């Protein structure tokens, strides 16, 4: 576990004091899977078909400068968080993939994760791009990110379509959805306020 967050009394969004585990440590990965297995997977008699791993990067606290995020996320078993920060999701995926296969080698693993890293598909992992604000420019950026992600050789990316309301502003008029072949004329696009 990363200790700086405990020393600084950091609380997660639910209000619990804690930190992230060091996924770069093989023993920590085994412990992480053991907790998932005992409290979820085996407990529900292998009734879990897929995992949705939100927060699969060591984002101990939002809205902090990068130097402080890295201080909260290290040091890792491999070295400084500055050197290994972006690879967290792949070693976290390794823990889940190999953990589930060790318990039930005949069941396919599927993992949806909020953070991606090159090569993660070897662990049956797909990436979800993460939360976005409810603005058209953010949706447009999702399309660009998805194309770039796919061009990097990663086969599957889910884009966030709903987003979070990041600003206090009036809602745009509702947009109509057209269904081809039903004779509806195209409506004017609702302007963004």
Regions inferred by a protein language model and the residue ranges of each:
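Catalytic-domain carbohydrate-binding cleft regions of carbohydrate-active enzymes
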Residues: 1-193
